[in-house]
Amino acid sequence: MSRYRGPRFKKIRRLGSLPGLTSKRPRSGSDLRNQSRSGKRSQYRIRLEEKQKLRFHYGLTERQLLRYVRIAGKAKGSTGQVLLQLLEMRLDNILFRLGMASTIPGARQLVNHRHILVNGRLVDIPSYRCKPRDIITTRDEHRSRALIQNSIDSSQKEELPKHLTLHSLQYQYKGLVNQIIDSKWVGLKINELLVVEYYSRQT
């Protein structure tokens, strides 16, 4: 299944706020109206919607998300917590959380178009897994700097998660990854256990 490129507001009206997909918010009460129309949701549908929330927020294909679930399942610790850490430490998501892009699709475009450096080296893979002490900057070109500045200026000034720091000097921005993200700083309201459960019942 390919990455979603359809109407974004349609998704947030059904699934709720998806800040990685769009800065728009569903109208107050729209979720309740949708639920009342459809009646009581089955357990399968609840699990499916949590999985879809995760997929659309982080901008993943079905195959990509399944791969992350499998990697998390083989790691030590809670599969759900490890899954969220893997997704949050992707380069495209780190750029979004730093405010250097207004959405995750926007961050992915910055990476694909070769505007982003990690530790001084060009990285054009949005799924690149960032590590503690990574330094994220832009290429020393006017266009690269201007794109980041536009995102910084237009972004909602939200508190940065504790695992990240953003420094600025004369329109040059430098993001620092201080540590692996703590689960309480994940940028999406999600029940990750339902996502793991969804996939465990598919096998």
From Swiss-Prot:
Entry-linked SMART domains: Ribosomal_S4, S4
Keywords annotated in UniProt: Chloroplast, Plastid, Ribonucleoprotein, Ribosomal protein, RNA-binding, rRNA-binding
A GO MF term: rRNA binding
A GO CC term assigned to this protein in UniProt: small ribosomal subunit
Highest taxon of the lineage: Eukaryota
Residues covered by the S4 RNA-binding domain: 89-169
PROSITE patterns: RIBOSOMAL_S4, S4
Keyword GTP-binding: no
Protein localization: Plastid, Chloroplast
InterPro entries noted in UniProt: Ribosomal_uS4, Ribosomal_uS4_bac-type, Ribosomal_uS4_CS, Ribosomal_uS4_N, S4_RNA-bd, S4_RNA-bd_sf
Main localization, broad class: plastid
Keyword Cell membrane attributed: no
GO biological process, one term: ribosomal small subunit biogenesis
Region described as Disordered: spans on this chain: 15-43
Gene3D superfamilies, per database record: Ribosomal Protein S4 Delta 41, Chain A, domain 1, RNA-binding S4 domain
Subunit description: Part of the 30S ribosomal subunit. Contacts protein S5. The interaction surface between S4 and S5 is involved in control of translational fidelity.
PANTHER family: 30S 40S RIBOSOMAL PROTEIN, SMALL RIBOSOMAL SUBUNIT PROTEIN US4M
Similarity comment text for this entry: Belongs to the universal ribosomal protein uS4 family.
Function: One of the primary rRNA binding proteins, it binds directly to 16S rRNA where it nucleates assembly of the body of the 30S subunit.
Record-given protein name: Small ribosomal subunit protein uS4c
